Amino acid sequence: NILIIGANGFTGRQILNDLSNKEQYNATGCSLHPDILPNGDGKYHFVTTDIRDEAAIKHLFKEAQPDAVINCSALSVPDYCETHHEEAYLTNVTAVEQLAYLCEIYKSRFIHLSTDFVFDGKIDENSGQLYTEESLPAPVNYYGFTKWKGENRIAEICSNYAIVRVEIVYGKALPGQHGNIVQLVMNRLNAGQEIRVVSDQWRTPTYVGDVSDGVQRLIENTANGIFHICGDECMTIAEIAFHVADCMKLDRSLIHPIT
């Protein structure tokens, strides 16, 4: 039995769809809002639940009896988190703590999606060095702080867990989902609109299907700890935008790198 929390989100939906099409899994999707794709091909159960509601999430665990819980839910817009500290902490820390405690009670493996925003980005890009699972977090915004705090609480509470850090996850989004950098660039350029993108921020863009595949491996892998799932190319946001324009044969002159 697999419980996917945040199943209406971009990454969560991919994981739900993939797991629900495998015979060995009995998948339950959970989101704050009703199923975004109720007539999809996957075989799954869908529940509308607010994970910030302690009673509701306890009831969900009782009904789902999960062997593994995959938490893709988060308040993940950095600028919003900066001005809504209480809401961000409640979603990214307090609710995560509750999930961790329930996973211990039900002996569920807890797979929690986190972010590269736990780092400060000051690593020397000229050295060719990348952040590893052993790198020391040093968040510079409140979103990153809450995600790091959530990671720490999971490690303190859970005896069976995997923290999965991802970044710049891309792929095709469904209507109503938050977009990603690839879709954003395509939409703007197709509309003939200019787009400004940073050229001094290095990231490793990751295909959403690869994240799903990595999470599936971690369901069966009993190792505890932090795992980075990312693409194999490091590039700036501006370079990503230019790649999208070239691949889709769109007007790259509309892209303006900034620092």
Stretches found by the model and what they are:
Residues 29-38, 50-51, 73-74:
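N-terminal Rossmann-fold cofactor-binding loop
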Residues 214, 221-259:
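Mid/C-terminal beta-alpha module of Rossmann-like enzyme folds, strongest
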Residues 69, 83-111:
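NAD(P)-cofactor binding segment of oxidoreductase domains
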Residues 5, 30, 72-73, 110-116, ...:
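SDR active-site strand-loop-helix element
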Residues 48-91:
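NAD(P)H-binding glycine-rich loop region in Rossmannoid oxidoreductase-like domains
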Residues 152-203, 210, 216:
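NAD(P)-dependent short-chain dehydrogenase/reductase
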